[in-house]
Amino acid sequence: MDYLVDILHRSKKPIIEGFFIETLEGLIFDVKGLLHPPDRIIAYVRYIPNTKGDRVSRRGIRYRKIYSLLDREKFLEKKYPYYIYYDPIFGRRLQGVPLGSIRYIYDPIERLKELMYSESLDPLEKAAVELVEEVAERAGISRSTIGITGSILVGLHSSTSDIDLVVYGEKEGISVYRALLDMSKERVKIRPYNEEELERLFIFRSRDTFIPLDTFLKIERKKILQGIFKGREYFIRLVKRPEEFGEKYGDRRYKPIGRVRLRAIVSDTRDSIFTPCRYILDKVKVISGHAPKPIKEVVSYRGRFREQARKGDTVIVEGVVELVENEESYCRVLVGEYPRDILIPEEV
C-alpha cells in the first residue's frame, strides 16, 4: 500500500488539502488548506475506530464517520482534547495533529497510482479511475496532477460512496474546470444533479449549513465540480500548489472580530473554483456587525462554497469578519465555520 506513507520515511512533499493523516490512536483526519504551522498539520477528524462502525479498513479495523463540524469538535473535546489547539496566526481554536502523533500519511496521488496499476478493483474504484482518465484526457493534463481523496483514499468506502478527486495546480485546475463545463453541457459522460438528488444533498448539507431549499436548488444545479458519473456522485477539488498560493504560514495574521452581515457586488471570481475559495468584493454595505477596516473579500475552506456566485452578482454574506494583518491591513469574511454562515446571490 504505497499510498500509506510512514511518517518516519515520508518524502518532503507538502501535506495539503486532499491528504488524510492517521494518528497513533488510529483516528483519521482530513487535511485542510495549504497553510500549516511547522509543528503540526491543520486537519479535522473524519473517521474514528468504533467496534460498531459500518466501515472496515484493509487492516480489519471498524470505523465510524463523523459528519458535521460540531460533532467532530465535540468528539475531540471529550476524547482527545490535545488535537484541539489555539493557533496564533489564525487567531482561533483549530483541530490539528502534531507531527509526532502522525502514524501514516495518506497521499491521494500515490493512491491513484496504486489503483491505476491494480488488477483487482471494486466497481467504485474502477469508476473513479475511469473518471480520472476521462477528465485528464479532456483537460489535456497529466494524470500525475490528479489524486483520489475521500473514503477511497483511506480504504473506507462502501458501494454507495461518492468519487472524490483532487487536482493540483492552478493551470491544471482551470483546464479541468473548462473540460467539466464542456462535458456537463454534453451530458454524455457526466451530468449535473437532478432535482431528487439535489434534495438529498440538501438534507445532508443542512446538518451544518442552513439555507432555504429553493435557494439551495437554484445555486447547486449550476455547479459542475460535482455531479453524476456512471450513476455515482463525484466531487472534485481544485487545489493550487503551495508556491502558487501566494502566502506562507505566518505571512499574515488573522484576528476574528465578530459576526457580520453584508451586501456586496462580486468583482473577481478567479479563485472561486479552488479550495480554499475566494471572492473579491466591491461596494460593500455592512447590514449588521462591525469591521475595523474595509472588507475586501470572502473566503471559505469548505468545498460547498465554491461556484457559489459569479462576477457581477450582488451577494448577501454572513460569517466571521477577520482583520488581516500584514503590510496593508484589511478585513475579510470567513464562511463555512458556523451553520448560519451564508454566501448567496441576491438574484436567486
Regions found by a protein language model. Give the residues of each.
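Catalytic core of pol beta-like nucleotidyltransferases
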Residues: M1-T160, Y168-V348
